[in-house]
């Protein structure tokens, strides 16, 4: 499917969604990732009118047709990358600030081509992690590695995680000898990472990957981290 077709499909949502039925959160459009059949997500913000992906607002709502409803918008809604979706959702403003401040040009990396899974801490998670400190107090190289500890190098959906049940995967964070640090996941009670952070909103699909919103920053792990998180080490 060509880009123009995908952009048009990115303006179509299944079902009749009157403006009064829309609420802040994510919906799926008919556009898909180029390398999968996953439907792209759209962030709807109803805090001040109806704003879509942070770039377009509903100008004329609720034009009824025989097979659906049309909402006239004031800007074309482009195909969103991971960074686009982070920018669209005010709950991720601290994450965007951290990505911008860290070494490694992470905003560019996560805006570019690739297939990533980002575990995205919300603003409350960053506030708890910083514990009164400023983002600028964290060395930029350390901040980059902490952020990369939330990035996987492939698309992993919540269905994939639940299907696996529990186990280890690799993040893009650097460990000893430049090896990639591991991440432990367990789906016994929701989806939990390294025993410290849980998925609050799953499967925000973008052109270059997927986002899972999480409720806590995942620190760089030690041996004790995995011993405490993995029930196989409980005895």
Roles of regions detected by a PLM:
Residues 1-235:
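Mature, structured domains of secreted/extracytosolic soluble proteins
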């Amino acid at each position: 499917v060509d880009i123009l077709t995908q952009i048009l499909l990115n303006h179509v949502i299944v079902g009749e969604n009157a403006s009064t039925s829309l609420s802040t959160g994510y919906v799926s459009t008919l556009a898909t990732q180029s390398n999968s059949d996953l439907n792209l997500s759209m962030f709807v913000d109803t805090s001040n009118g109806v704003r879509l992906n942070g770039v377009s607002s509903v100008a004329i709502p609720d034009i009824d047709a025989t097979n659906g409803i049309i909402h006239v918008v004031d800007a074309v809604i482009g195909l969103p990358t991971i960074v686009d979706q982070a920018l669209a959702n005010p709950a991720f403003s601290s994450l965007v600030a951290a990505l911008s401040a860290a070494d490694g040009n992470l905003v560019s990396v996560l805006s570019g081509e690739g297939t990533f899974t980002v575990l995205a801490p919300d603003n409350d998670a960053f506030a708890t992690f910083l514990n009164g400190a400023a983002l600028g107090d964290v060395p930029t190289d350390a901040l980059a590695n902490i952020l990369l500890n939330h990035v996987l190098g492939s698309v992993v959906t919540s269905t994939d995680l639940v299907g696996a049940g529990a186990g280890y995967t690799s993040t893009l964070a650097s460990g000893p000898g430049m090896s990639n640090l591991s991440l432990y996941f367990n789906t016994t009670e929701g989806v939990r990472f390294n025993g410290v952070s849980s998925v609050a909103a799953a499967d925000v699909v973008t052109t270059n990957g997927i986002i899972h919103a999480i409720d806590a920053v995942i620190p760089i792990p030690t041996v004790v981290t995995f011993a405490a998180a993995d029930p196989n080490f409980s005895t």
